[in-house]
Amino acid sequence: MKKIITTTLLVGFVALTNSIYAQQATKVQRQAIQTDNIETFKSAFTKAEYDKCIDIKENSYTMLSYSIRHNRKNITTFLLANNSDVNKACKGITPLMVAATYGDTETAKLLLKKGANKNAKDLNGKTAKDYATENKQTATAAIL
Protein backbone atom coordinates (compact mmCIF):
# COMPACT_ATOMS: atom_id res chain seq x y z
CA MET A 1 0.00 0.00 0.00
CA LYS A 2 2.84 2.38 0.91
CA LYS A 3 4.49 1.66 -2.47
CA ILE A 4 1.26 2.50 -4.34
CA ILE A 5 0.88 5.80 -2.49
CA THR A 6 4.53 6.70 -3.10
CA THR A 7 4.24 5.87 -6.81
CA THR A 8 1.01 7.87 -7.12
CA LEU A 9 2.60 10.88 -5.42
CA LEU A 10 5.68 10.66 -7.64
CA VAL A 11 3.60 10.47 -10.84
CA GLY A 12 1.51 13.43 -9.65
CA PHE A 13 4.62 15.45 -8.84
CA VAL A 14 6.16 14.80 -12.28
CA ALA A 15 2.92 15.77 -14.04
CA LEU A 16 2.60 18.94 -11.94
CA THR A 17 6.23 19.91 -12.55
CA ASN A 18 5.83 19.45 -16.30
CA SER A 19 2.66 21.54 -16.37
CA ILE A 20 4.26 24.35 -14.36
CA TYR A 21 7.32 24.57 -16.57
CA ALA A 22 5.64 23.96 -19.92
CA GLN A 23 4.91 27.00 -22.01
CA GLN A 24 2.40 27.58 -24.76
CA ALA A 25 3.70 27.63 -28.34
CA THR A 26 2.97 30.85 -30.19
CA LYS A 27 1.34 30.84 -33.60
CA VAL A 28 4.67 31.88 -35.15
CA GLN A 29 6.43 28.98 -33.43
CA ARG A 30 3.83 26.44 -34.58
CA GLN A 31 4.11 27.73 -38.14
CA ALA A 32 7.92 27.65 -37.99
CA ILE A 33 7.90 23.95 -37.12
CA GLN A 34 5.44 23.20 -39.93
CA THR A 35 7.74 24.72 -42.57
CA ASP A 36 10.64 22.35 -41.82
CA ASN A 37 12.87 25.30 -42.72
CA ILE A 38 15.83 25.67 -40.38
CA GLU A 39 16.20 29.45 -40.78
CA THR A 40 12.50 30.00 -40.07
CA PHE A 41 12.78 27.68 -37.07
CA LYS A 42 15.85 29.52 -35.71
CA SER A 43 14.05 32.87 -36.00
CA ALA A 44 11.06 31.59 -33.97
CA PHE A 45 12.93 29.78 -31.18
CA THR A 46 15.90 30.59 -29.01
CA LYS A 47 18.40 27.82 -28.35
CA ALA A 48 17.22 27.79 -24.73
CA GLU A 49 13.73 26.83 -25.94
CA TYR A 50 14.84 23.75 -27.87
CA ASP A 51 14.61 21.49 -24.81
CA LYS A 52 11.72 23.15 -23.00
CA CYS A 53 8.36 21.43 -22.83
CA ILE A 54 5.94 23.40 -24.99
CA ASP A 55 2.21 22.78 -24.90
CA ILE A 56 0.62 22.36 -28.30
CA LYS A 57 -3.07 21.50 -28.24
CA GLU A 58 -3.45 18.91 -25.48
CA ASN A 59 0.10 17.55 -25.60
CA SER A 60 3.48 18.72 -24.41
CA TYR A 61 6.62 18.35 -26.52
CA THR A 62 10.22 19.38 -26.75
CA MET A 63 11.00 20.72 -30.18
CA LEU A 64 12.83 17.47 -30.93
CA SER A 65 9.79 15.36 -30.03
CA TYR A 66 7.46 17.64 -31.97
CA SER A 67 9.64 17.59 -35.09
CA ILE A 68 9.78 13.78 -34.92
CA ARG A 69 6.01 13.58 -34.38
CA HIS A 70 5.39 15.64 -37.53
CA ASN A 71 8.16 14.11 -39.63
CA ARG A 72 10.11 17.36 -39.97
CA LYS A 73 13.43 15.77 -40.92
CA ASN A 74 15.38 19.01 -41.45
CA ILE A 75 14.50 20.35 -38.02
CA THR A 76 15.07 16.96 -36.37
CA THR A 77 18.53 16.74 -37.94
CA PHE A 78 19.29 20.35 -36.96
CA LEU A 79 18.25 19.76 -33.34
CA LEU A 80 20.30 16.58 -33.06
CA ALA A 81 23.33 18.35 -34.55
CA ASN A 82 22.85 21.11 -31.97
CA ASN A 83 22.81 18.68 -29.04
CA SER A 84 19.14 18.71 -28.11
CA ASP A 85 18.48 16.52 -25.09
CA VAL A 86 17.50 13.14 -26.55
CA ASN A 87 16.22 11.99 -23.14
CA LYS A 88 14.14 15.05 -22.20
CA ALA A 89 10.63 13.87 -21.35
CA CYS A 90 7.50 16.00 -21.43
CA LYS A 91 4.64 14.45 -19.49
CA GLY A 92 6.79 11.32 -19.36
CA ILE A 93 7.21 10.96 -23.14
CA THR A 94 10.73 10.99 -24.63
CA PRO A 95 11.69 11.66 -28.26
CA LEU A 96 12.51 7.94 -28.66
CA MET A 97 8.98 7.03 -27.57
CA VAL A 98 7.60 9.42 -30.19
CA ALA A 99 9.78 7.89 -32.92
CA ALA A 100 8.70 4.42 -31.79
CA THR A 101 5.01 5.33 -31.83
CA TYR A 102 5.18 6.51 -35.44
CA GLY A 103 7.58 3.84 -36.68
CA ASP A 104 10.37 6.28 -37.51
CA THR A 105 13.10 3.65 -37.39
CA GLU A 106 15.82 5.85 -38.90
CA THR A 107 15.26 8.61 -36.37
CA ALA A 108 15.11 6.04 -33.56
CA LYS A 109 18.54 4.79 -34.67
CA LEU A 110 19.90 8.36 -34.65
CA LEU A 111 18.48 8.97 -31.19
CA LEU A 112 20.08 5.78 -29.88
CA LYS A 113 23.44 6.82 -31.40
CA LYS A 114 23.09 10.16 -29.62
CA GLY A 115 22.55 8.39 -26.30
CA ALA A 116 18.77 8.00 -26.00
CA ASN A 117 17.84 5.67 -23.16
CA LYS A 118 15.76 2.87 -24.67
CA ASN A 119 14.89 1.66 -21.16
CA ALA A 120 13.32 4.97 -20.06
CA LYS A 121 9.74 4.56 -18.87
CA ASP A 122 6.79 6.90 -19.19
CA LEU A 123 4.43 7.73 -16.33
CA ASN A 124 2.66 4.38 -16.89
CA GLY A 125 5.86 2.31 -16.96
CA LYS A 126 5.96 1.86 -20.75
CA THR A 127 9.20 1.96 -22.76
CA ALA A 128 9.79 3.03 -26.36
CA LYS A 129 9.65 -0.64 -27.38
CA ASP A 130 6.21 -0.90 -25.76
CA TYR A 131 5.05 2.07 -27.84
CA ALA A 132 6.40 0.53 -31.04
CA THR A 133 4.80 -2.83 -30.27
CA GLU A 134 1.41 -1.31 -29.35
CA ASN A 135 1.37 0.62 -32.63
CA LYS A 136 2.46 -2.39 -34.71
CA GLN A 137 5.76 -0.74 -35.67
CA THR A 138 7.65 -4.03 -35.92
CA ALA A 139 10.78 -2.68 -37.62
CA THR A 140 11.21 -0.02 -34.96
CA ALA A 141 10.43 -2.46 -32.13
CA ALA A 142 13.14 -4.77 -33.49
CA ILE A 143 15.90 -2.18 -32.93
CA LEU A 144 14.69 -1.39 -29.44
Feature map (PLM): residue ranges:
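Non-cytosolic coordination micro-motifs
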Residues: 113
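Short, solvent-exposed interaction modules
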Residues: 100, 108
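Non-membrane alpha-helical segments in proteins
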Residues: 61-70, 95-98
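Ankyrin repeat arrays, specifically the small/polar loop and inter-repeat linker segments at the C-terminal end
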Residues: 3-7, 12-31, 35-61, 73-74, ...
